Swiss-Prot record:
Belongs to the intron maturase 2 family. MatK subfamily. It is found in: Plastid, Chloroplast. This is Maturase K. The gene is matK. Usually encoded in the trnK tRNA gene intron. Probably assists in splicing its own and other chloroplast group II introns.
Length: 506
């Protein structure tokens, strides 16, 4: 956070609160590189980090200074107008720079707002993607209906830029952003396709996520406003609302429209038990009351996306299901509400009664089939789940190979320790353990049995199963019953900020 303050103060000293001069500063790209280098990863994946150098950045900035966008000759028709030629590497560097620069003022506003609200200490826990599961455990057992909604895209580029302009008041910066997106990312078509969106999100992930999150934040602000207006009990949210141009004018317009055109239908939206959860590109809407209200909110979402954001969404893609009969996928987990039935014997005077008690419990399990599919894609096993060797890593030392497998196993165990049933997690550990042994045997050109007998690596490879117990023994008392109880129960780690690379949430 202090780094952002320093860089913004440098820009303010040269220009009056403008962000665009930071695009031409070398330290911005160095900051983007350090963020990518220090990011927590689960599977090693070489990117442009290995190609980064200060010399490449200097050449890039020089070309950006010298480029004249008003003069494009016929000989340059096959070249990129932004830099003179097509180069995905330079595109990724520039997009990282744009993302870093535009994030600076929001980090400063967010930090100041958190300091005023005095929630700095708990902010890291609130940032955890697993902080949503304790909320679901408390609330969803009392609800009856759920709707799993995929937030639609693509959205036109101009709408994304206009939404961002409500927050950042810097016209030259947005001119540069438009030039980059239109010419370098080939977003000059009238209606962008899903293929172009997918290509842009993979080659420029940080900038794409930043723009996409602003689109989601905009529609959620309208949804929250209408939700508060639909019931007399106002919701209190810890979210930070930043200053935006025309926001209050838009609110007044919405109030006027709803008071005139929807004065009779608005009372039907009064549902105090509706809950909304968003994760990645999906959201979950759950309610305790009849599905009629859920159906109302479904069509509200569809009309909101179509009328305000020009995004087409089909009503049949949003299904309303009974929570006790439907399982939904959330952050790599399968979740549903399970009914537990128990019989209690009650005696009154000389009469004995059998009373059946039904209780609800949120069941969260590891989806073994999608996870095995992800492991097979990463070449740790085949499609049937049989472990195979990893010949690509055979050039590394034995210690590095074991450490790589242990890191992946540790991260998966850390991520899926909130599962209700640990059997699937043990199977994943078993696949990684045998894949590690086969990789070491392949390196030494030996069979698995001969390698284990010769090297005696069984004790070292036991770390795949014993490490989690050692961590729990440091947290809880060294009582076998206590450790066994916590080993069976769910434990949510609130230091997880990113989704695991092997998690398939499709």
């Amino acid at each position: 956070m202090k780094e952002y303050r320093v860089y913004l103060e440098r820009a303010r000293s040269r220009q009056q609160d403008f962000l665009y001069p930071l695009i031409f500063r070398e330290y911005i790209y160095g900051l983007a590189y350090s963020h990518n280098f220090n990011k927590s990863i689960f599977v090693e994946n070489g990117g442009y980090d290995n190609k980064y150098s200060l010399l490449n950045v200097k050449r890039l900035i020089t070309r950006m200074y010298q480029q004249n966008h008003l003069i494009i000759s016929a000989n340059d028709s096959n070249k990129n107008p932004f830099l003179g030629y097509n180069n995905n590497f330079y595109s990724q560097i520039i997009s990282e720079g744009f993302a870093i620069v535009v994030e600076i003022p929001f980090f400063l506003q967010l930090s100041s707002s958190l300091e005023e609200a005095e929630i700095i200490k708990s902010y890291k826990n609130l940032r955890s993607i697993h902080s949503v599961f304790p909320f679901l455990e408390d609330k969803f057992t009392y609800l009856n209906y759920v709707s799993d909604i995929r937030i639609p895209y693509p959205i036109h580029l101009e709408i994304l830029v206009q939404i961002l302009r409500y927050w950042v008041k810097d016209v030259p910066f947005f001119h540069l952003l438009r030039v980059f997106l239109y010419h370098f990312c080939n977003w000059n078509c009238f209606i962008p396709t899903k293929k172009s969106i997918s290509t842009f999100s993979k080659s420029n992930p940080r900038l794409f996520l930043f723009l996409y999150n602003f689109y989601v934040c905009e529609y959620e602000s309208i949804f929250l406003f209408l939700r508060n207006k639909s019931y007399h009990l106002r919701l209190k949210s810890f979210s930070v609302f930043f200053e935006r141009i025309f926001f209050y004018a838009k609110r007044e317009h919405l109030v006027e429209v709803f008071s005139k055109d929807f004065s009779y239908t608005l009372p039907f939206f009064k549902d105090p038990n509706i809950h909304y959860v968003r994760y990645q590109g999906k959201c979950i809407l759950a309610s305790k009351n009849v599905p009629f209200l859920m159906n109302k909110w479904k069509y509200y979402f569809i009309h909101l996306w179509q009328c305000f954001f020009d995004v087409w969404s089909q009503p049949r893609t949003i299904n309303i299901n009974q929570l006790s009969e439907h399982s939904f996928q959330l952050l790599g987990y399968f979740s549903n509400v399970r009914l537990n039935r128990s019989v209690v014997r009650s005696q009154m005077l000389e009469n004995t009664f059998l009373i059946e008690i039904v209780s609800k419990k949120l069941d969260i399990i590891v989806p073994i089939i999608p996870l095995i599919r992800s492991l097979a894609k990463a070449k740790f096993c085949n499609v049937l789940g049989h472990p195979i060797s990893k010949p690509v890593w055979a050039d590394s030392s034995d210690f590095d190979i074991i450490e790589r497998f242990l890191r992946i196993c540790r991260n998966l165990s850390h991520y899926y320790n909130g599962s209700s049933k640990k059997k699937s997690l043990y199977r994943i550990k078993y696949i990684l353990r045998l894949s590690c042994i086969k990789t070491l045997a392949c390196k030494h050109k030996s069979t698995v049995r001969a390698f284990l007998k010769r090297s005696g690596s069984e004790e070292l490879l036991e770390e795949f199963f014993t490490e989690e117990e050692e961590i729990l023994s440091l947290i809880f008392p060294r009582d076998s019953f206590t450790l066994h109880r916590f080993h069976r129960n769910r434990i949510w780690y609130l230091d997880i900020l990113f989704s695991n690379d092997l998690v398939n949430d499709e």
